[in-house]
């Protein structure tokens, strides 16, 4: 296991979570009844992506509305990217960041988890508001 992955696991455990490693080698954890993935990328880069995958399925005919909601959220939420994933059938969200040390990693992970914890509710609210316009 890489030093980077070990540090991320250690920080998540320190924060009170029980992270696991999936078959692809990604870190996953449960947060507010959601499965969150931590994608570590290159070992030599102090950069990670925290992802809430496929939290909304796109119904036929709502593609334009969903794209507008994703754009609005990505524009308004600091740190978060909300986007239609590669399948064009689901919406996912990520928080991507660089960190300088273990303390910064912990702070950024805490903020990312908090943000991803509410992104689904904010998405639904924005979708309702935009569909009424």
Give the label of every model feature segment.
Residues 1-37, 84-85:
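Charge-rich, low-complexity N-terminal segments
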Residues 3-7, 58-66, 104, 108-115:
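Short amphipathic alpha-helical segments
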Residues 26-28, 46-48, 89-91:
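Hydrophobic residues embedded in beta-strands of well-ordered beta-sheets
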Residues 32-63:
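Long, continuous compositionally biased terminal/linker segments
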Residues 52-90:
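Short, internal acidic amphipathic alpha-helical interface segments
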Residues 88-111, 124-125:
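Well-ordered alpha/beta subsegment
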Residues 115, 119-126:
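Long, charge-dense
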Residues 127-133:
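Short, highly charged C-terminal tails/helix-capping segments
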């Amino acid at each position: 296991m890489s030093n980077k992955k070990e540090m991320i696991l250690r920080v998540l455990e320190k924060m009170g979570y029980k992270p696991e490693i999936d078959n692809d080698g990604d870190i996953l954890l449960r947060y507010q009844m959601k499965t969150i993935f931590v994608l570590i990328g290159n070992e030599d880069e102090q950069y990670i992506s925290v992802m809430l995958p496929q939290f909304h399925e796109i119904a036929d005919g709502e593609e334009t509305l969903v794209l507008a909601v994703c754009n609005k959220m990505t524009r308004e939420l600091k740190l978060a990217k909300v986007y239609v994933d590669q399948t064009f059938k689901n919406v996912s969200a990520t928080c991507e960041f660089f960190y300088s040390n273990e303390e910064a990693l912990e702070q950024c992970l805490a903020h990312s988890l908090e943000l991803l914890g509410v992104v689904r509710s904010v998405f639904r609210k924005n979708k309702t508001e935009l569909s009424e316009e």
